[in-house]
């Protein structure tokens, strides 16, 4: 692998892909099942085809390039194609591009790998449009039903089901797309935090990916006049929600490596002189221990019960995501370390505080993640950046790891 050429190709591809956004000049916004996703998918498939891969779009809307091996069982490498709103040009898509470069290097060796290898650019990992996420991994694992994809809707009321139809996919076959042939998963990703840069390390070897439990909470009050309704008779949805929300962060601080975040806060009727009748907010609990996540979730429910009872109000919770923490494969992590050692690159073990495709795959098969430093620790913003040099390093490490996996023949 020629590192300078690899770095230049990665840089060019990411610059080109950053143009497929619905918010030009304000970062990358590339939601699933949109024209921007379609254009980026076509670009990625063209790059896959250039190195001789068989390309196609699967029924989740992800794009795949396949290199046939000696046997049909498959090792998959890649990351996601979609983005958050007004995000960066590296989150997810850099991993898909690095996957192409790793497989390019295998093709150039002329070796037919033992396992077939697929590069994947997955769809709707972020959950930014439909408030769920990790879509491709769930589809490939057979976790989603037709009822599920009819239930998840975007802010315009469009369901995943209808969006898939419009995109030319078959939502009624969503439960028939489990990939039992995929035996391992490798993901290159930007760190999205400051740890590697602060430690002056080239590569992060991910030990564990945090679990995530996410929900939409609605607190129902009653709209009344703000001046004439006494305080002891009010059903103020904002006051009730605020009391619950105030405890969420404090509760998370009691647990090591746990975080909790409230966002996407909506108030109705959102008018100056009317007591709020409804508050809807998203909440996201993360941690390396499932029991810590669940205790925080239950603590919020207990608070909702108490506060809504006090104010004679009601609430609803819709759980939109619940994935357990995943410990990544020991052997694969050792392959990554060995590659770094042999190539003279510094590395360190790290925990991923972000959710990733690899955690869905890693729950049922050997999986690994390779992190590259994020400059300034910035991510999910237009300022997001990782150096092409370190992305090329990650591609080379992924290449070495894929070869080692194929050599072992023990998946």
What is each PLM-predicted segment?
Residues 2-34, 123, 380:
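N-terminal capping segment at the start of a domain
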Residues 10-23, 75-79, 346-397:
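Zn-dependent metallopeptidase/amidohydrolase metal-coordination segment
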Residues 22-68:
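A non-catalytic alpha/beta surface segment that caps or lines the substrate-entry region
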Residues 47, 51, 63-94:
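Catalytic-core environment of secreted peptidases
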Residues 124-125, 131-291:
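Midchain, well-structured core segments that form catalytic/ion-binding scaffolds
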Residues 225, 229-254, 299, 372-411:
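His/Asp/Glu-rich mid-to-C-terminal helical/loop segments that flank catalytic regions of hydrolases
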